[in-house]
Amino acid sequence: MADETSADINNPALQPNGEDTSPAIGLISQYVKDLSFENPNAPAVYQWQGAPQVDVQFNIAADSVGDNLYEVLLKIDVTSKTDKGTSFVIELKYAGLFGVRNVPDDQLQPFFLAEAPRILFPFARRVVADAVQDGGFPALLLEPIDFHGLFMQQVQAAQGEQVGDGAPVGQA
């Protein structure tokens, strides 16, 4: 046993080099960057009958904000309308600040467009629900979003476009 341990201690390949070279990504902070709630037809809207039509749109962006620091922004726009008019409009920009170390560039985009939004979404969802409820409406719970599935669809669509660009059109 003692011989095995001393052999490991003397092996230069197993000695620490003082650097941490393993890939790491960490959430440093998350925050509401911008929040807007509009209730354009108050107080009449509270007397309207019928279920509103709710339209939800979202977008994801990632920007470098410093050395090994990236801000991932989840933008959610919700519009609720009835046949009498707009009930409410909410616009939320919810962001997360991520520290990145030793991650290959080809792995950053999948993280920023699939995994980071998945991490941020439950918190953004709560902000939307609270804002809608604070505006005098029943809390709006957004359905979960499969960010990974959406990212894979975008990748496949982009690959399809690249393949389609080189393919001949028509019959020869």
UniProtKB/Swiss-Prot annotation:
Main location: cytoplasm
GO CC, any one term: cytoplasm
Molecular function, one GO term: unfolded protein binding
Biological process, per Gene Ontology: protein folding; protein tetramerization; protein transport
The entry's keywords: Chaperone, Cytoplasm, Protein transport, Translocation, Transport
Subcellular locations according to the entry: Cytoplasm
Location of region: Disordered: 1-22
Role this protein plays: One of the proteins required for the normal export of preproteins out of the cell cytoplasm. It is a molecular chaperone that binds to a subset of precursor proteins, maintaining them in a translocation-competent state. It also specifically binds to its receptor SecA.
Subunit annotation: Homotetramer, a dimer of dimers. One homotetramer interacts with 1 SecA dimer.
Name of the molecule in the record: Protein-export protein SecB
Organism: Sphingopyxis alaskensis (strain DSM 13593 / LMG 18877 / RB2256)
